[in-house]
Amino acid sequence: MIIDIITIFPNFFDQFLTTSKIKHAIEDKRVEINIHDLRLYTDLKGGKIDDTPYGGGAGMLMIYPPFHKLINKLKTKDTYTVLLSPQGNVFNQQVATKWRDEIKHLILICGHYEGIDDRIQNLIDEEISIGDYVLTGGEIPAMVITDSITRLIPGVINEASYMEDTHQQGLLKYPQYTKPDEYLGMSVPDILKSGHHEKIRLWRLEKSLEKTYLKRPDLLVNRDLTKEESKILSKIKKNLESQ
């Protein structure tokens, strides 16, 4: 997969690209990540890429021509171009998996100031947000999305690790424990030390459903529960009601 990130702050990504799994994924050629300085594509003096908005208003807008030049230079028949914007569709684990499977070349556009000249809509396939809040620019969302997709690429991390991630299966992850067995009176649940794989699986499923029901019930609304999950969830609700 190729990910091209368009930004006016290319140095923002230096540490991100040279640390941990992202670094290894690049070195192993499992992903290609390129950072493009938008200022190199403006015709205005001093690398200027913004101007005042027509009709008035606070702040400055990023001008359209540099985006047009750079994106058309990068685009291929396999390109999917995304504008990072608080107005966009919310990015989630399902989107990350879908893009991992279906997109060969992803362009991420980082906005700044009061936004971008709306003619940018002629160049993009989708607007994406990482949540209902506003940041100073698109660089952090670009890193979030790049990290989320890259870790799903085969060989970057063990598949068993991400298949049990929170949200990967549409549920929050069950509680996990490691050594020491007991600390300050807090002990690891006995069932996890039993060696009984089926009982451990059922315990984890129950805890996962319980955590999701308590913290993110919205995730269960559209979930097609299995008979096993429905039975366990009914038990959870009864137990909570009796408390």
From Swiss-Prot:
Recorded catalytic activity of this chain's protein: guanosine(37) in tRNA + S-adenosyl-L-methionine = N(1)-methylguanosine(37) in tRNA + S-adenosyl-L-homocysteine + H(+)
Enzyme superclass (EC): transferase
Gene Ontology MF annotations: tRNA (guanine(37)-N1)-methyltransferase activity
List of residues binding S-adenosyl-L-methionine: 111, 130-135
Transferase keyword on record: yes
Places the protein is found: Cytoplasm
Any one GO cellular component localisation term in the record: cytosol
UniProt GO BP: tRNA N1-guanine methylation
Keywords: Cytoplasm, Methyltransferase, S-adenosyl-L-methionine, Transferase, tRNA processing
Coiled coil: none
EC number(s) from the headed UniProt entry: 2.1.1.228
tRNA processing keyword on record: yes
InterPro entries xrefs: Alpha/beta_knot_MTases, tRNA_m1G_MeTrfase_C_sf, tRNA_m1G_MeTrfase_TrmD, tRNA_m1G_MTases_N, tRNA_MeTrfase_TRMD/TRM10
Disulfide links within the chain: none
Matching PANTHER family: TRNA (GUANINE-N(1)-)-METHYLTRANSFERASE
Subunit organization: Homodimer.
Family in the record: Belongs to the RNA methyltransferase TrmD family.
Role played: Specifically methylates guanosine-37 in various tRNAs.
Stated name of the protein: tRNA (guanine-N(1)-)-methyltransferase
